[in-house]
């Protein structure tokens, strides 16, 4: 029973840390809206917890935080760019200590740069197929 309680306490701490990292990421990444005008990052927050509403190229989107099990029963965070229809356009995984999963560095090393990567990934996902495929003339 003691081991289960310790594991539950650890998972709760990791969950809290992931939530705090997401909040800090959103606060720091918001400066990107001042540099580029292809997306709008509102100052007010009407979004549910662990998410952030914004617009990308005039279309409503949401930045969502999800948690998922990782190696050795650790909890990982997953930031997702989600379109209005619920499609996940881009995502970025990280551990509770902020270490990124699929690239070097930490989540808070350069939040505006990471958000820009996510946004560009989201735009690329929604490119019409005829623009992606080169048609022979």
Predicted regions and their residues:
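Ampiphathic alpha-helical segments that act as solvent-exposed interaction surfaces
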Residues: 83-137
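Charge-rich, low-complexity N-terminal segments
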Residues: 1-44
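Amphipathic, interaction-prone secondary-structure segments
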Residues: 36-88
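Alpha-helical context
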Residues: 1-5, 9, 55, 95, ...
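Terminal low-complexity, poorly structured segments
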Residues: 7, 28, 53, 111-116
């Amino acid at each position: 029973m003691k081991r289960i309680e310790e594991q539950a306490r650890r998972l709760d701490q990791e969950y809290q840390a992931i939530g705090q990292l997401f909040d800090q990421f959103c606060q720091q990444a918001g400066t990107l809206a001042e540099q580029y005008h292809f997306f709008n990052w509102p100052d007010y927050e009407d979004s549910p917890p662990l998410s952030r509403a914004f617009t990308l190229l005039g279309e409503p989107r949401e930045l969502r935080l999800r948690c998922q099990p990782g190696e050795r029963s650790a909890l990982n965070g997953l930031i997702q760019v989600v379109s209005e229809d619920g499609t996940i356009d881009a995502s970025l995984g990280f551990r509770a200590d902020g270490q990124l999963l699929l690239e070097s560095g930490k989540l808070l090393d350069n939040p505006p740069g990471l958000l820009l990567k996510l946004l560009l990934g989201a735009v690329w996902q929604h490119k019409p197929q005829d623009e992606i495929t080169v048609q022979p003339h």
